[in-house]
Amino acid sequence: MPMYQVKPYHGGSAPLHVELPTCMYRLPNVHSKTTSPATDAGHVQETSEPSLQALESRQDDILKRLYELKAAVDGLSKMIHTPDADLDVTNILQADEPTTLATNTLDLNSVLGKDYGALKDIVINANPASPPLSLLVLHRLLCERYRVLSTVHTHSSVKNVPENLVKCFGEQARKQSRHEYQLGFTLIWKNVPKTQMKFSVQTMCPIEGEGNIARFLFSLFGQKHNAVTLTLIDSWVDIAMFQLREGSSKEKAAVFRSMNSALGRSPWLVGNELTVADVVLWSVLQQTGGSSGAAPTNVQRWLKSCENLAPFSTALQLLK
């Protein structure tokens, strides 16, 4: 089949001369028999720049710290999941020295933010069919620490709210102007599926669930704990809300055994000081009827210790 012929674009054996643009760097000819370097290799850096070396060194340090943190977390996880974990954690808790509620101070601005000229007001929506006793206990404890302006309202979605719930904060006679209070605490009895807390619409979303709200309120006391203690406290709060309140009879029995074991080593669930774990577990036990005589010995003793404190005994009157 005949085809058309293309004329050669260079002559015979003469070298090919191509004008290359000067805006790009040159590379050596891969077909050349010589190994001469590129004619213009000024773009190649013989040594790394100091800034690049500093970046590499910083990256190595970060990776080293990450490996150390991973090793620490792995060791802690192994300690908690081994049979002798209780003994190890107890030793760590004894070495820790938590601050007490009575002596520690906290700047509310560091937690709630600074709002010039406005009272920091915490608004809680709660269902009167299931009063969140832990929040009422924490309210009383907050009143012992700060100047709290307390108010109670009833939403139109509920009717016939018991008188003791309407007056759960007692007779609130305002003795000073609003700006002289440090904290506002507003409780609204409302038909809601879960207890809700709203503080600042601009800076934070609502918090749902009695356990989560209790965590937030207890943080206002400024207690300092190490990582192990904080993990145990959060674990007890989750156990109260998910296993003790919503779990099966077997799960509840397992919770009682764990509580009895922990209270056999210390007066409170986590160490020698009252924590939010004690408040939330006590509240759930009262609401679910778990505080009856069927509770183990150490749990019964712990319940009496709670009820000997004024904030607990006052909240307990709301169920009668």
Curated annotation (Swiss-Prot):
Q: Which GO terms describe its biological process?
A: apoptotic process; negative regulation of cell population proliferation; positive regulation of neuron apoptotic process; positive regulation of protein ubiquitination; protein ubiquitination; protein-containing complex assembly; translation; type II pneumocyte differentiation
* Cross-referenced CDD domains: GST_C_AIMP2
Where do the GST C-terminal domain residues begin and end? 220-317
What are the GO MF terms of this UniProt record? molecular adaptor activity
**Phenotype reported upon loss of the gene:** Reduced levels of component enzymes and associated factors of the aminoacyl-tRNA synthase complex, lack of complex formation and lethality within two days of birth. Neonates display severe hyperplasia in a number of organs including lung, intestine and liver, lung failure, and disturbed thymocyte proliferation and differentiation. Embryonic fibroblasts deficient in Aimp2 are resistant to apoptosis following UV irradiation.
UniProt-annotated stretches for the region Interaction with PRKN? 82-162
Start and end residues of each stretch annotated as Interaction with TP53: 162-225
* Post-translational modifications reported in the UniProt record: Phosphorylated on serine residues in response to UV irradiation. Ubiquitinated by PRKN, leading to its degradation by the proteasome.
Q: Which Cys pairs does UniProt list as disulfide-bonded?
A: none
| Residues modified as Phosphoserine | S36
> Where is it predominantly found?
cytoplasm
**Entry GO CC:** aminoacyl-tRNA synthetase multienzyme complex; cytosol; nucleus
Localization recorded for this chain is:
Cytoplasm, Cytosol; Nucleus
Which stretches are transmembrane?
none
The record's keywords, sorted A to Z, are: Apoptosis, Cytoplasm, Developmental protein, Differentiation, Nucleus, Phosphoprotein, Protein biosynthesis, Ubl conjugation
User: Which InterPro entries does the UniProt record give?
Assistant: AIMP2 (IPR042360), AIMP2_LysRS-bd (IPR031889), AIMP2_thioredoxin (IPR041503), Glutathione-S-Trfase_C_sf (IPR036282), GST_C (IPR004046)
Q: How does it assemble?
A: Part of the multisynthetase complex (MSC), a multisubunit complex that groups tRNA ligases for Arg (RARS1), Asp (DARS1), Gln (QARS1), Ile (IARS1), Leu (LARS1), Lys (KARS1), Met (MARS1) the bifunctional ligase for Glu and Pro (EPRS1) and the auxiliary subunits AIMP1/p43, AIMP2/p38 and EEF1E1/p18. Interacts (via N-terminus) with KARS1. Interacts with EPRS1. Forms a linear complex that contains MARS1, EEF1E1, EPRS1 and AIMP2 that is at the core of the multisubunit complex. Binds FUBP1 (via C-terminus).
Q: What does this protein do?
A: Required for assembly and stability of the aminoacyl-tRNA synthase complex. Mediates ubiquitination and degradation of FUBP1, a transcriptional activator of MYC, leading to MYC down-regulation which is required for aveolar type II cell differentiation. Blocks MDM2-mediated ubiquitination and degradation of p53/TP53. Functions as a proapoptotic factor.
Query: What protein name does the entry list?
Result: Aminoacyl tRNA synthase complex-interacting multifunctional protein 2
Q: What's the source species for this entry?
A: Mus musculus
